[in-house]
Amino acid sequence: MINDGVAKAMKVNSMWIDMSTSVPEAALNVKANLNQSVAMIDAPVAGMSVGADKGTLSIFAGGNASDLERAKPLFDIMGDPSKFFKCGEWGTGYAVKLVLNMLWFNQFVASVEALMLGVKAGVDLETLRKALVGSPCQSIMLERDLMGLLNDGDYDEGFAVALACKDLKLAGDLARNVGVPMEVHATVENIYRRARARYGDRAGEMIPAKLYEDDTNTLLRIK
């Protein structure tokens, strides 16, 4: 829309709100192409389609403080007001979303790897999961996010592995731009790339678990 004339046609004092997942540099590029009277906010979200339907999304907003206040009534309708985060200037909303996605993928792979290790060592899967939930390793991943996979073999096709790989690449790009070494991220990204190559772009975001299952001939399923 930046290049097809929409930006130049925006009215004075209107707002450009981008809710996609991108890199901070994208916000600066958009702002540079907007009329100075047009406000720019980057406001990616978390909560998936369920959060969108229920109006309970988490929103991570970057932009001028006055612009964020002006847009907040809209955000309060779309998301949970207690989960509206003013992240800083332009691009910081994008940065928070990339960090969130990267950490979720890291936690997912680490959790699957840990569970597979315990199961192959002879521990009952549900006993192992409950032991971890009741330990300092407790996490939403072990309590909630993995349950569709462990109970039903659901690799979560609601978010494709191709999109997961895109987000991991963007997180890596951000890390290189700001000079942060990301060795764990690099390993997780490689695992996701291998899963994408083996199972296809449309496989779900939890498909890396199938790499472990196929390579060990062991399903991670609660009996």
Walk through the language-model features, giving the residues of each.
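Hydrophobic alpha-helical segments
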Residues: 215-223
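Helical "substrate-binding/catalytic lid" subdomain
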Residues: 92-215
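A short helix->loop->beta-strand "cap" motif at the edges of active sites that frequently abuts
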Residues: 10-14, 36-38
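Short amphipathic alpha-helical/adjacent loop interface patches that line ligand
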Residues: 3, 14, 27, 168, ...
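Mobile acidic interaction elements
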Residues: 13-14, 30, 221-222
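Short, conserved loop/helix-junction motifs that constitute active-site signature segments
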Residues: 6-12, 77-78
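Rossmann-fold dinucleotide-binding core
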Residues: 2, 21-101, 105
